[in-house]
């Protein structure tokens, strides 16, 4: 009995071992099956997209590629509209380059390669469709390496983060997907099976291409959008605790302690300094290194760092609920809770105004604010009709005109030197004032202010020399400008209608082109930020008032009636709206904005330092010292207003 018991007990471990072996062997096919299902996932997703609204296509290579090419290459059909579709290359050529056969079923590898070719087509569509680039005479490797070396200054063995963002920018524009909420690049790479921090390589880039094409056909926005996805907030919270999927009870306790003790919102770059001064603020339970690392990683993802963005209540509702007017229920509040916790955790809304990362202006803000600005500019330019009040007093007209000329010189040169040029050179982006060190971050403003002081100093020397030394008995040739034309001659009858008409036409054409350039500059400024739009509008408005007053005087002196001159002046000012909407449409790219700002700064400097100073130095009047004071008052007022805007522009509410 004892022997049998020992024998039976000795068989138990052997039985368990054999069971383990058999279970392992039986598990292997299931694992292989799961991998097989994963490898065919992109093909299944693509078939589902291609069959949307139609009969499911048979898995036939030629027909599927043709359907895919039509949906990708024909925007009108892709958006559900009817119209002719002219493909820039044949589906058969696309299939052959990808290594597929006409009659066989479409394989996963071929789908991925075709997707990569379609990405290349989207990026180089203009060259391909204009016959400058022929896709049929190149091998697949050529297109693969072309995408990997999209940026010449980066490693051509991997598709870097910047190159991926470039491709996604092309696809967003090509497929015209909504940019309110976008799938982030890291999520897209993870969905494509890319785990390397360096990005996709030769083997994984086709998988990434297939995911991009499939999601884009589904209308999913990819890359950097105007608002983050709802998942971002939860990922931020988990990454701050060095967790990925689950939280332990101790980590939840750590999160609560952090929220309770971060009421003062100490930023990571101030922790070490404040530890010496305020030891009571930081408790032993807090670990700020996690927050620092997560902030650093996220800030490198793209041009906008969501970690330092203070979202409004309306923006949080738009992110999580996709609605703005409905009441927020308890279930809605549960969905929004990660966003609220993330805002408390990141302390974004407690940062100084000039350190908060601001969202780019929305389309409604850009078009709304800029339209109001140009409308005010048009109404301001009509102040030239105020000349009617000074028909009987030419001297008062000259004094008022010189006040506005000085104001125009101050605002134009101030906007160019204190705002536009620093923005083009990237000096605004470096502004991150440290507490108690305001003068260090604004150093370039004080240096440029010294430059303006030099301009003003030499103007004073020249003006005083003219007032004290030069005889005042003869006008210089420059005194024959429109601004000094006798008011009494404005209504004089025409002597030569043809010449007068030609002069009026020249004035109107010049005004129209000038207003068009002003509108272009305002459009680019409001595309950059509301602050830039305000400063540029103020500068242009101060310049337009004396400019239009002078032109209005010329129109009256050319023989036009008062009503006709007002109407012509108003019509020429409407070209500013044309320039505005062109500027808004072409300046979405920051690079285009910089070039428009560069040309605008040059135009402002020319007007303020070349065209207008002769009016200020050589104008004749019976009260020269009064004019001298008014000119300097206008200059100082213009420069002072732009200086205050340059210092406090970050505090202007959007």
Curated annotation (Swiss-Prot):
Top-level taxon in the UniProt lineage: Eukaryota
Key words of the record: Ion transport, Membrane, Transmembrane, Transmembrane helix, Transport, Zinc, Zinc transport
Membrane topology per record: Multi-pass membrane protein
GO molecular-function term, one example from the UniProt record: zinc ion transmembrane transporter activity
Span(s) of short sequence motif XEXPHE-motif: 543-548
GO cellular component labels: plasma membrane
Disulfide bond annotation, renumbered to this chain: none
A Pfam family it matches: Zip
Gene Ontology biological-process entries: intracellular monoatomic cation homeostasis; neural tube formation; neuron projection extension; zinc ion import across plasma membrane
Subcellular location field: Membrane
Extracellular side: 1-207, 391-398, 470-501, 587-589, 648-654
Matches recorded under InterPro entries: ZIP, ZIP4_12_EF-hand, ZIP4_N, ZIP_Transporter
Segments crossing the lipid bilayer: 208-228, 370-390, 399-419, 449-469, 502-522, 566-586, 590-610, 627-647
Cytoplasmic side: 229-369, 420-448, 523-565, 611-626
Reactions performed catalytically: Zn(2+)(in) = Zn(2+)(out)
Family: Belongs to the ZIP transporter (TC 2.A.5) family.
Job description of the protein: Uniporter that promotes Zn(2+) import from the extracellular space to the cytoplasm across the cell membrane. The transport activity is temperature dependent. May play a role in neurulation and neurite extension. May play a key role in maintaining intracellular zinc content at levels that reduce the inhibitory effects of rises in oxidative stress on spermatogonia and spermatozoa viability during spermatogenesis.
Protein name from the UniProt record: Zinc transporter ZIP12
Organism: Macaca fascicularis
Gene: SLC39A12
